[in-house]
Amino acid sequence: MEYKLLIGLEVHVQLGLKTKAFCGCKNDFGGIPNSRVCPICLGLPGALPSVNKELVSSAILAGHATNSTIRNIVKFDRKHYAYPDLPKGYQISQNDEPICENGFIFIKTSLGVKRINIARIHMEEDSGKSLHLLSNDNQSYIDFNRAGAPLLEIVSQPDIRSGEEAVAYLNALREIFRYLDLSECSMENGSFRCDVNINLLINENDVNYKTPISEIKNLNSFKSVKLAIDYEESKQKEEWILYRKTLESVGKCTMGFDDKKGITVLQRSKETISDYRYIKDPDLPLIKLESDYIENIKSHRMVELPFDARIRLQEQYGLSDFDVVTLTSDKNLVKYFEEAALTSSEPKKVANWILSEVLSVLNEREIGILDFNLPASYIGELVEFILNGKISGKISKEIFLEMVDRNVSSITIINEKKLEQISDKSFIESIVIEVLNENPKSIELYKKGKSHAVKFMMGQIMRKTSGKVNPVLSNEILMNKLQDV
Protein backbone atom coordinates (compact mmCIF):
# COMPACT_ATOMS: atom_id res chain seq x y z
CA MET A 1 0.00 0.00 0.00
CA GLU A 2 1.44 3.33 -1.10
CA TYR A 3 0.56 6.33 1.01
CA LYS A 4 1.85 9.57 2.42
CA LEU A 5 0.97 11.44 5.58
CA LEU A 6 -0.88 14.73 5.29
CA ILE A 7 -0.22 16.73 8.45
CA GLY A 8 -1.27 20.29 9.14
CA LEU A 9 -0.65 22.07 12.42
CA GLU A 10 -2.72 24.76 14.12
CA VAL A 11 -0.52 26.61 16.59
CA HIS A 12 -1.88 29.10 19.13
CA VAL A 13 0.67 31.60 20.42
CA GLN A 14 -0.32 33.74 23.40
CA LEU A 15 1.36 37.10 22.92
CA GLY A 16 3.31 38.66 25.76
CA LEU A 17 1.51 42.01 25.57
CA LYS A 18 0.90 44.16 28.63
CA THR A 19 -2.89 44.08 28.23
CA LYS A 20 -5.51 41.76 26.78
CA ALA A 21 -6.72 41.76 23.19
CA PHE A 22 -9.87 43.87 23.51
CA CYS A 23 -9.76 45.45 26.98
CA GLY A 24 -7.30 47.06 29.38
CA CYS A 25 -6.95 44.14 31.81
CA LYS A 26 -3.41 43.03 32.57
CA ASN A 27 -2.26 40.13 30.40
CA ASP A 28 -0.29 37.78 32.63
CA PHE A 29 0.00 34.12 33.60
CA GLY A 30 -1.37 32.66 36.84
CA GLY A 31 -2.31 34.77 39.84
CA ILE A 32 -5.42 34.77 42.01
CA PRO A 33 -8.36 33.36 39.99
CA ASN A 34 -10.62 36.00 38.43
CA SER A 35 -8.42 38.87 39.63
CA ARG A 36 -7.67 40.26 36.15
CA VAL A 37 -11.15 40.63 34.68
CA CYS A 38 -13.53 43.41 33.67
CA PRO A 39 -17.03 43.70 32.12
CA ILE A 40 -15.52 43.35 28.63
CA CYS A 41 -13.63 40.08 29.11
CA LEU A 42 -16.49 38.74 31.26
CA GLY A 43 -18.96 39.47 28.46
CA LEU A 44 -21.31 41.56 30.56
CA PRO A 45 -24.19 43.36 28.78
CA GLY A 46 -23.31 46.75 27.32
CA ALA A 47 -19.53 46.29 27.58
CA LEU A 48 -17.84 47.35 24.33
CA PRO A 49 -14.44 46.02 23.22
CA SER A 50 -11.64 48.05 21.67
CA VAL A 51 -8.72 46.62 19.70
CA ASN A 52 -5.30 46.48 21.33
CA LYS A 53 -3.02 48.19 18.79
CA GLU A 54 -0.11 45.99 19.84
CA LEU A 55 -2.11 42.90 18.88
CA VAL A 56 -2.35 44.17 15.31
CA SER A 57 1.31 45.24 15.11
CA SER A 58 2.41 41.86 16.53
CA ALA A 59 0.38 40.06 13.87
CA ILE A 60 1.98 42.22 11.17
CA LEU A 61 5.45 41.42 12.52
CA ALA A 62 4.63 37.69 12.56
CA GLY A 63 3.45 38.04 8.97
CA HIS A 64 6.74 39.58 7.90
CA ALA A 65 8.69 36.85 9.71
CA THR A 66 6.73 34.11 7.91
CA ASN A 67 6.90 35.70 4.45
CA SER A 68 3.14 36.20 4.44
CA THR A 69 0.89 38.53 2.50
CA ILE A 70 -0.51 41.10 4.93
CA ARG A 71 -3.98 42.56 4.42
CA ASN A 72 -4.55 46.30 4.46
CA ILE A 73 -8.03 45.92 5.96
CA VAL A 74 -8.51 44.21 9.33
CA LYS A 75 -11.90 42.65 10.08
CA PHE A 76 -12.91 40.82 13.25
CA ASP A 77 -15.63 38.16 13.43
CA ARG A 78 -17.62 36.42 16.12
CA LYS A 79 -17.15 32.67 16.36
CA HIS A 80 -20.13 31.27 18.27
CA TYR A 81 -20.00 28.19 20.45
CA ALA A 82 -21.22 27.29 23.91
CA TYR A 83 -18.69 26.40 26.57
CA PRO A 84 -18.56 27.36 30.26
CA ASP A 85 -15.21 29.17 29.97
CA LEU A 86 -16.42 31.35 27.05
CA PRO A 87 -18.41 34.04 28.88
CA LYS A 88 -19.74 35.94 25.86
CA GLY A 89 -20.99 32.84 24.08
CA TYR A 90 -18.69 33.72 21.20
CA GLN A 91 -15.00 34.29 20.60
CA ILE A 92 -13.68 37.36 18.80
CA SER A 93 -11.60 35.93 15.96
CA GLN A 94 -11.07 36.27 12.20
CA ASN A 95 -12.81 34.00 9.73
CA ASP A 96 -12.65 34.65 6.01
CA GLU A 97 -10.22 37.57 6.01
CA PRO A 98 -7.22 36.73 8.23
CA ILE A 99 -4.62 39.45 8.61
CA CYS A 100 -1.88 37.24 7.09
CA GLU A 101 -2.08 34.64 4.31
CA ASN A 102 0.09 32.50 2.03
CA GLY A 103 3.30 32.51 4.04
CA PHE A 104 6.08 29.97 4.49
CA ILE A 105 9.07 29.08 6.64
CA PHE A 106 11.93 26.63 6.20
CA ILE A 107 12.74 23.72 8.47
CA LYS A 108 15.72 21.39 8.63
CA THR A 109 15.49 17.67 9.43
CA SER A 110 17.66 14.61 8.86
CA LEU A 111 16.39 14.64 5.25
CA GLY A 112 17.55 18.22 4.64
CA VAL A 113 15.88 21.60 4.25
CA LYS A 114 12.17 21.81 3.46
CA ARG A 115 9.68 24.62 2.92
CA ILE A 116 6.45 24.47 4.93
CA ASN A 117 3.65 26.67 3.62
CA ILE A 118 1.45 28.63 6.02
CA ALA A 119 -2.18 29.06 5.02
CA ARG A 120 -3.00 31.88 7.41
CA ILE A 121 -2.28 33.76 10.61
CA HIS A 122 -5.21 35.33 12.37
CA MET A 123 -5.84 37.26 15.58
CA GLU A 124 -8.24 36.14 18.28
CA GLU A 125 -8.87 36.15 22.02
CA ASP A 126 -8.32 33.27 24.41
CA SER A 127 -11.02 31.63 26.51
CA GLY A 128 -11.04 31.23 30.29
CA LYS A 129 -9.77 28.11 32.01
CA SER A 130 -11.87 25.35 33.56
CA LEU A 131 -10.54 23.79 36.74
CA HIS A 132 -11.82 20.31 37.57
CA LEU A 133 -11.15 19.41 41.19
CA LEU A 134 -10.92 15.84 42.42
CA SER A 135 -13.42 16.02 45.27
CA ASN A 136 -16.61 14.37 46.45
CA ASP A 137 -18.84 17.22 45.23
CA ASN A 138 -17.57 16.72 41.65
CA GLN A 139 -17.58 20.46 40.96
CA SER A 140 -15.71 22.49 38.36
CA TYR A 141 -14.52 26.06 38.67
CA ILE A 142 -13.71 28.65 36.03
CA ASP A 143 -10.86 31.16 36.08
CA PHE A 144 -11.47 34.02 33.62
CA ASN A 145 -8.02 35.59 34.03
CA ARG A 146 -7.05 34.11 30.65
CA ALA A 147 -10.30 35.17 28.94
CA GLY A 148 -9.52 37.81 26.34
CA ALA A 149 -5.77 37.15 26.29
CA PRO A 150 -4.26 38.06 22.88
CA LEU A 151 -3.63 35.10 20.58
CA LEU A 152 -2.24 34.50 17.12
CA GLU A 153 -3.24 31.26 15.42
CA ILE A 154 -0.83 30.01 12.78
CA VAL A 155 -2.35 27.42 10.44
CA SER A 156 0.00 25.46 8.19
CA GLN A 157 -0.84 23.78 4.92
CA PRO A 158 -0.82 19.95 5.13
CA ASP A 159 2.80 19.90 3.94
CA ILE A 160 4.24 18.00 6.90
CA ARG A 161 4.98 14.33 6.29
CA SER A 162 6.27 12.93 9.60
CA GLY A 163 6.49 13.46 13.32
CA GLU A 164 10.08 14.61 12.90
CA GLU A 165 9.01 17.33 10.46
CA ALA A 166 6.17 18.39 12.77
CA VAL A 167 8.56 18.85 15.69
CA ALA A 168 11.05 20.72 13.47
CA TYR A 169 8.25 23.05 12.30
CA LEU A 170 7.10 23.72 15.87
CA ASN A 171 10.67 24.41 16.94
CA ALA A 172 11.14 26.81 14.03
CA LEU A 173 7.93 28.70 14.86
CA ARG A 174 8.79 28.89 18.54
CA GLU A 175 12.26 30.24 17.74
CA ILE A 176 10.80 32.92 15.45
CA PHE A 177 8.33 34.19 18.05
CA ARG A 178 10.98 34.19 20.76
CA TYR A 179 13.48 36.04 18.55
CA LEU A 180 10.85 38.69 17.88
CA ASP A 181 10.08 38.98 21.62
CA LEU A 182 6.41 38.31 20.86
CA SER A 183 5.95 35.42 23.29
CA GLU A 184 7.74 33.13 25.72
CA CYS A 185 6.19 30.23 23.78
CA SER A 186 6.01 28.00 26.84
CA MET A 187 3.94 24.85 26.49
CA GLU A 188 4.04 24.52 30.28
CA ASN A 189 2.09 27.72 30.92
CA GLY A 190 -0.04 27.45 27.78
CA SER A 191 1.46 30.27 25.73
CA PHE A 192 2.31 27.82 22.92
CA ARG A 193 -0.39 25.27 22.10
CA CYS A 194 -0.71 22.89 19.19
CA ASP A 195 -3.47 20.92 17.46
CA VAL A 196 -2.56 18.32 14.83
CA ASN A 197 -4.68 17.52 11.76
CA ILE A 198 -3.64 14.23 10.22
CA ASN A 199 -4.82 11.78 7.59
CA LEU A 200 -3.41 9.56 4.85
CA LEU A 201 -3.34 10.02 1.09
CA ILE A 202 -3.46 6.45 -0.23
CA ASN A 203 -2.76 5.41 -3.80
CA GLU A 204 -4.24 2.13 -5.02
CA ASN A 205 -4.19 1.24 -8.69
CA ASP A 206 -3.45 4.87 -9.61
CA VAL A 207 -6.51 6.07 -7.67
CA ASN A 208 -6.07 8.41 -4.69
CA TYR A 209 -8.10 8.09 -1.50
CA LYS A 210 -7.99 10.25 1.62
CA THR A 211 -8.70 8.74 5.01
CA PRO A 212 -10.81 10.67 7.57
CA ILE A 213 -9.00 13.58 9.24
CA SER A 214 -8.24 13.32 12.94
CA GLU A 215 -7.78 16.64 14.73
CA ILE A 216 -5.76 15.91 17.86
CA LYS A 217 -6.32 18.67 20.41
CA ASN A 218 -4.24 20.25 23.15
CA LEU A 219 -0.96 18.37 22.83
CA ASN A 220 1.22 19.59 25.67
CA SER A 221 4.75 18.74 24.49
CA PHE A 222 6.74 18.17 21.33
CA LYS A 223 7.17 14.56 22.42
CA SER A 224 3.38 14.14 22.59
CA VAL A 225 3.03 15.63 19.11
CA LYS A 226 5.40 13.05 17.64
CA LEU A 227 3.89 10.14 19.57
CA ALA A 228 0.34 11.14 18.58
CA ILE A 229 1.32 11.38 14.90
CA ASP A 230 3.09 8.01 14.97
CA TYR A 231 0.08 6.38 16.63
CA GLU A 232 -2.45 7.94 14.23
CA GLU A 233 -0.40 6.87 11.22
CA SER A 234 -0.45 3.26 12.39
CA LYS A 235 -4.13 3.39 13.38
CA GLN A 236 -5.32 4.95 10.13
CA LYS A 237 -3.40 2.40 8.05
CA GLU A 238 -5.04 -0.42 9.99
CA GLU A 239 -8.52 1.13 9.74
CA TRP A 240 -8.15 1.62 6.01
CA ILE A 241 -7.33 -2.05 5.54
CA LEU A 242 -10.29 -3.12 7.72
CA TYR A 243 -13.00 -0.58 6.84
CA ARG A 244 -11.80 1.53 3.87
CA LYS A 245 -13.44 4.65 5.29
CA THR A 246 -12.76 7.85 3.35
CA LEU A 247 -12.75 11.54 4.20
CA GLU A 248 -15.80 12.06 2.01
CA SER A 249 -17.85 9.44 3.86
CA VAL A 250 -16.77 10.12 7.45
CA GLY A 251 -15.37 13.66 7.50
CA LYS A 252 -13.37 14.96 10.40
CA CYS A 253 -13.37 14.10 14.09
CA THR A 254 -11.77 15.56 17.20
CA MET A 255 -9.40 13.39 19.20
CA GLY A 256 -7.61 13.69 22.51
CA PHE A 257 -4.25 12.11 23.30
CA ASP A 258 -3.70 9.87 26.32
CA ASP A 259 -0.08 10.46 27.34
CA LYS A 260 0.05 7.45 29.64
CA LYS A 261 -1.30 4.96 27.12
CA GLY A 262 0.19 6.66 24.06
CA ILE A 263 -3.09 6.49 22.12
CA THR A 264 -5.59 8.93 20.64
CA VAL A 265 -9.16 8.90 21.97
CA LEU A 266 -12.31 10.05 20.17
CA GLN A 267 -13.87 13.14 21.78
CA ARG A 268 -16.51 14.24 19.28
CA SER A 269 -17.34 14.58 15.62
CA LYS A 270 -15.85 17.81 14.32
CA GLU A 271 -17.98 20.89 13.89
CA THR A 272 -18.10 22.52 10.47
CA ILE A 273 -17.62 26.22 9.75
CA SER A 274 -21.39 26.72 9.63
CA ASP A 275 -21.73 25.32 13.16
CA TYR A 276 -19.82 28.33 14.47
CA ARG A 277 -22.24 30.82 12.85
CA TYR A 278 -19.52 33.33 12.02
CA ILE A 279 -20.64 36.94 11.65
CA LYS A 280 -18.72 40.19 11.46
CA ASP A 281 -18.36 41.67 14.94
CA PRO A 282 -20.61 44.76 14.91
CA ASP A 283 -18.80 46.29 17.90
CA LEU A 284 -15.42 46.42 16.14
CA PRO A 285 -15.01 48.63 13.06
CA LEU A 286 -12.83 47.78 10.08
CA ILE A 287 -9.24 48.94 10.50
CA LYS A 288 -7.31 50.27 7.51
CA LEU A 289 -3.58 49.57 7.60
CA GLU A 290 -1.49 51.92 5.48
CA SER A 291 1.32 50.26 3.53
CA ASP A 292 3.85 52.62 5.15
CA TYR A 293 2.70 51.47 8.60
CA ILE A 294 3.12 47.81 7.64
CA GLU A 295 6.62 48.41 6.25
CA ASN A 296 7.58 50.59 9.21
CA ILE A 297 6.96 47.68 11.59
CA LYS A 298 9.29 45.52 9.51
CA SER A 299 12.08 48.11 9.35
CA HIS A 300 11.96 48.90 13.08
CA ARG A 301 11.20 45.54 14.68
CA MET A 302 12.41 42.77 12.38
CA VAL A 303 15.58 40.94 13.44
CA GLU A 304 17.74 38.29 11.82
CA LEU A 305 15.81 35.05 12.31
CA PRO A 306 17.35 31.72 13.39
CA PHE A 307 17.30 29.97 10.00
CA ASP A 308 19.08 32.90 8.32
CA ALA A 309 21.47 33.31 11.25
CA ARG A 310 22.58 29.68 10.99
CA ILE A 311 23.42 30.04 7.32
CA ARG A 312 25.37 33.26 7.94
CA LEU A 313 27.28 31.90 10.94
CA GLN A 314 28.39 28.85 8.97
CA GLU A 315 29.48 30.92 5.99
CA GLN A 316 31.15 33.67 8.01
CA TYR A 317 32.83 31.65 10.75
CA GLY A 318 32.98 28.08 9.43
CA LEU A 319 30.95 26.70 12.33
CA SER A 320 29.39 23.22 12.36
CA ASP A 321 25.67 22.43 12.24
CA PHE A 322 25.76 21.63 15.95
CA ASP A 323 27.51 24.89 16.77
CA VAL A 324 25.04 27.11 14.92
CA VAL A 325 21.94 25.28 16.13
CA THR A 326 23.06 25.64 19.75
CA LEU A 327 24.17 29.25 19.40
CA THR A 328 20.96 30.33 17.67
CA SER A 329 18.79 28.76 20.35
CA ASP A 330 19.00 32.25 21.89
CA LYS A 331 19.56 35.41 19.85
CA ASN A 332 21.46 36.90 22.80
CA LEU A 333 23.87 33.96 22.73
CA VAL A 334 24.59 34.73 19.05
CA LYS A 335 25.30 38.34 19.98
CA TYR A 336 27.61 37.27 22.82
CA PHE A 337 29.53 34.92 20.52
CA GLU A 338 30.02 37.54 17.81
CA GLU A 339 31.25 40.11 20.32
CA ALA A 340 33.73 37.56 21.69
CA ALA A 341 34.85 36.54 18.19
CA LEU A 342 35.90 40.12 17.44
CA THR A 343 38.80 39.78 19.90
CA SER A 344 40.11 36.43 18.64
CA SER A 345 41.75 35.13 15.49
CA GLU A 346 39.93 31.79 15.79
CA PRO A 347 36.13 32.29 15.97
CA LYS A 348 35.50 28.54 15.92
CA LYS A 349 37.62 28.10 19.04
CA VAL A 350 35.62 30.91 20.67
CA ALA A 351 32.38 29.12 19.77
CA ASN A 352 33.68 25.87 21.27
CA TRP A 353 34.61 27.69 24.48
CA ILE A 354 31.22 29.35 24.79
CA LEU A 355 29.32 26.14 24.02
CA SER A 356 31.30 24.17 26.59
CA GLU A 357 32.60 26.34 29.43
CA VAL A 358 30.19 29.29 29.32
CA LEU A 359 27.06 27.17 28.88
CA SER A 360 28.26 24.89 31.67
CA VAL A 361 28.31 27.86 34.06
CA LEU A 362 24.91 29.07 32.84
CA ASN A 363 23.38 25.64 33.40
CA GLU A 364 24.98 25.23 36.81
CA ARG A 365 23.72 28.64 37.96
CA GLU A 366 20.38 28.26 36.15
CA ILE A 367 20.71 31.63 34.42
CA GLY A 368 20.53 32.90 30.85
CA ILE A 369 23.25 34.65 28.87
CA LEU A 370 21.73 38.06 29.68
CA ASP A 371 22.38 37.37 33.38
CA PHE A 372 26.00 36.37 32.68
CA ASN A 373 28.02 39.44 33.65
CA LEU A 374 31.40 38.54 32.15
CA PRO A 375 32.05 40.73 29.06
CA ALA A 376 32.21 38.76 25.81
CA SER A 377 35.55 40.35 24.93
CA TYR A 378 37.10 38.62 27.95
CA ILE A 379 36.28 35.22 26.42
CA GLY A 380 37.86 36.11 23.08
CA GLU A 381 40.94 37.41 24.89
CA LEU A 382 41.24 34.22 26.95
CA VAL A 383 41.00 32.01 23.85
CA GLU A 384 43.66 34.13 22.14
CA PHE A 385 46.04 33.62 25.09
CA ILE A 386 45.57 29.84 24.73
CA LEU A 387 46.21 29.99 20.99
CA ASN A 388 49.41 32.02 21.24
CA GLY A 389 50.77 29.86 24.05
CA LYS A 390 50.57 32.47 26.79
CA ILE A 391 48.65 29.99 28.99
CA SER A 392 47.93 26.27 28.77
CA GLY A 393 44.54 24.78 28.02
CA LYS A 394 44.47 23.17 31.45
CA ILE A 395 45.16 26.32 33.45
CA SER A 396 42.79 28.32 31.24
CA LYS A 397 39.76 26.59 32.75
CA GLU A 398 40.85 27.53 36.26
CA ILE A 399 41.43 31.09 35.10
CA PHE A 400 37.98 31.19 33.49
CA LEU A 401 36.19 30.12 36.67
CA GLU A 402 38.00 32.82 38.63
CA MET A 403 37.13 35.35 35.91
CA VAL A 404 33.47 34.47 36.37
CA ASP A 405 33.63 34.67 40.16
CA ARG A 406 35.48 38.00 40.22
CA ASN A 407 34.24 39.48 36.92
CA VAL A 408 37.78 40.37 35.84
CA SER A 409 39.79 39.75 32.67
CA SER A 410 42.11 36.81 32.18
CA ILE A 411 45.19 39.05 31.93
CA THR A 412 44.45 40.41 35.41
CA ILE A 413 44.56 36.91 36.90
CA ILE A 414 47.55 35.83 34.81
CA ASN A 415 49.59 38.81 36.00
CA GLU A 416 48.45 38.52 39.63
CA LYS A 417 49.34 34.83 39.90
CA LYS A 418 52.22 34.83 37.42
CA LEU A 419 50.55 32.15 35.35
CA GLU A 420 51.98 33.09 31.97
CA GLN A 421 53.25 30.02 30.18
CA ILE A 422 56.96 29.86 29.34
CA SER A 423 57.54 29.44 25.61
CA ASP A 424 61.20 30.45 25.45
CA LYS A 425 62.83 27.68 23.40
CA SER A 426 66.33 28.09 24.80
CA PHE A 427 65.06 27.97 28.37
CA ILE A 428 62.92 24.89 27.71
CA GLU A 429 65.83 23.21 25.91
CA SER A 430 68.06 23.71 28.94
CA ILE A 431 65.43 22.12 31.20
CA VAL A 432 65.02 19.17 28.78
CA ILE A 433 68.79 18.55 28.73
CA GLU A 434 68.86 18.69 32.51
CA VAL A 435 66.06 16.09 32.76
CA LEU A 436 67.76 13.81 30.21
CA ASN A 437 71.06 13.94 32.11
CA GLU A 438 69.28 13.05 35.35
CA ASN A 439 67.30 10.13 33.89
CA PRO A 440 69.50 7.80 31.76
CA LYS A 441 67.28 4.82 32.63
CA SER A 442 64.26 6.58 31.13
CA ILE A 443 66.23 7.13 27.92
CA GLU A 444 66.99 3.39 27.74
CA LEU A 445 63.33 2.54 28.32
CA TYR A 446 62.31 4.95 25.54
CA LYS A 447 64.75 3.24 23.14
CA LYS A 448 63.08 -0.07 24.00
CA GLY A 449 59.70 1.35 22.95
CA LYS A 450 58.32 2.10 26.40
CA SER A 451 56.04 5.14 25.88
CA HIS A 452 55.57 5.72 29.60
CA ALA A 453 59.20 6.86 29.76
CA VAL A 454 58.31 9.97 27.74
CA LYS A 455 55.40 10.72 30.06
CA PHE A 456 57.72 10.41 33.05
CA MET A 457 60.28 12.81 31.58
CA MET A 458 57.54 15.30 30.63
CA GLY A 459 56.37 15.11 34.22
CA GLN A 460 59.89 15.97 35.39
CA ILE A 461 60.02 18.95 33.04
CA MET A 462 56.70 20.25 34.36
CA ARG A 463 57.82 19.68 37.96
CA LYS A 464 61.02 21.66 37.49
CA THR A 465 59.09 24.60 36.01
CA SER A 466 56.05 24.42 38.31
CA GLY A 467 53.94 23.51 35.29
CA LYS A 468 54.55 26.83 33.57
CA VAL A 469 56.31 25.71 30.39
CA ASN A 470 54.43 25.25 27.15
CA PRO A 471 53.66 21.49 27.15
CA VAL A 472 53.38 21.20 23.37
CA LEU A 473 56.68 22.95 22.75
CA SER A 474 58.34 21.04 25.60
CA ASN A 475 57.23 17.69 24.19
CA GLU A 476 58.48 18.66 20.73
CA ILE A 477 61.93 19.62 22.05
CA LEU A 478 62.11 16.48 24.22
CA MET A 479 61.31 14.19 21.27
CA ASN A 480 63.94 15.92 19.12
CA LYS A 481 66.58 15.49 21.83
CA LEU A 482 65.66 11.82 22.31
CA GLN A 483 66.31 11.22 18.62
CA ASP A 484 69.84 12.55 19.06
CA VAL A 485 70.87 10.51 22.12
From Swiss-Prot:
Record's keyword terms, sorted: ATP-binding, Ligase, Nucleotide-binding, Protein biosynthesis
Protein biosynthesis is among the record's keywords: yes
Catalytic activity: L-glutamyl-tRNA(Gln) + L-glutamine + ATP + H2O = L-glutaminyl-tRNA(Gln) + L-glutamate + ADP + phosphate + H(+); L-aspartyl-tRNA(Asn) + L-glutamine + ATP + H2O = L-asparaginyl-tRNA(Asn) + L-glutamate + ADP + phosphate + 2 H(+)
GO MF annotation, one: asparaginyl-tRNA synthase (glutamine-hydrolyzing) activity
InterPro entries from the UniProt entry: Asn/Gln-tRNA_amidoTrfase_suB/E (IPR017959), Asn/Gln-tRNA_Trfase_suB/E_cat (IPR006075), Asn/Gln_amidotransferase (IPR018027), Asn/Gln_tRNA_amidoTrase-B-like (IPR003789), GatB (IPR004413), GatB_Yqey_C_2 (IPR023168), Gln-tRNA_amidoTrfase_suB_CS (IPR017958), Gln_synth/guanido_kin_cat_dom (IPR014746)
E.C. no: 6.3.5.-
Similarity annotation: Belongs to the GatB/GatE family. GatB subfamily.
Function: Allows the formation of correctly charged Asn-tRNA(Asn) or Gln-tRNA(Gln) through the transamidation of misacylated Asp-tRNA(Asn) or Glu-tRNA(Gln) in organisms which lack either or both of asparaginyl-tRNA or glutaminyl-tRNA synthetases. The reaction takes place in the presence of glutamine and ATP through an activated phospho-Asp-tRNA(Asn) or phospho-Glu-tRNA(Gln).
Name of this protein: Aspartyl/glutamyl-tRNA(Asn/Gln) amidotransferase subunit B
Gene name for this UniProt entry: gatB
